[in-house]
Amino acid sequence: MGEEEEKKEKGDEIITAVYKVHLHCRKCACDIKKPLLRFQGVQNVDFDLEKNEIKVKGKIEVVKIHKQIEKWSKKKVELISPKPSEVKKTTTTTTTTSVVEKKTTEIKKDVIRTTVLKVHIHCAQCDKDLQHKLLKHKAIHIVKTDTKAQTLTVQGTIESAKLLAYIKKKVHKHAEIISSKTEEEKKKEEEDKKKKEEEDKKKKEDEKKKEEEKKKEEENKKKEGEKKKEEVKVEVTTKTITQVVEYKEIVKVEGQKDKDGNIPYFVHYVYAPQLFSDENPNACRIV
């Protein structure tokens, strides 16, 4: 009798369960809310479009409502609270525990991937139809289209081959896979890109340093060359000055007066005889 009373008390407890579902608009949320309010034991249903959450309050069985929401929405539903471990404790039968264990293992196994497809999108109506029909699938979470590039990006747990078949069946369009990557692969690619960027930056910095060193060496060489030129110029100028001084001194000696005050005869400078000069070969000739 004591065990039966405990079971009744557990069944009479008011629970607030939170489920995560992709809610496209208020109409989608209302389509789930109306049948939930008719469900046995449900007292209140609230939904949050921004967080994509549905809150169900009442004397309810969490697993059954989980199944019903998946059935009505035709989408993947995640149980946020109470956690699957708590649900196992509250349930009395072994069947409910096995269902929860299966669902937790399925959630762990499911890998979220983003596939980019090339599809012909004719107009805005085609775009809306594509998104509407693809979001009906349970394994598709987010759909984005680009009319200019004629591409379709799908995020979810669906495999690429199944996605192609689903598009051909429901939308009647031929699609080609451009890329299909999981979240782990994306993270690895981002890390590789960051490493490459860092390496490129280091290489550029090293090249800049080398160029600066070369420029400094060239400038030093130029400065040394200019100093040498200045030294040579100084030597040349000193030589010319000495020659001029000597010439002036000779002139002064010739122009001095005697003791009596008589000025001697001024000797005129005469060109040297060019009879045997190499500069004028025609000087010596027979007339």
UniProtKB/Swiss-Prot annotation:
Name one matching Pfam family: HMA
Record: residues binding a metal cation 2 = C123, C126
Stretches the record annotates as Disordered: 181-232
Q: Which PROSITE patterns match?
A: HMA_2 (PS50846)
What does the record list as coiled-coil region(s)?
179-235
Residues of the propeptide region, as annotated, are 285-287
Name the family the entry cites. Belongs to the HIPP family.
Name of the protein: Heavy metal-associated isoprenylated plant protein 4
This chain's source organism reads Arabidopsis thaliana (Mouse-ear cress)
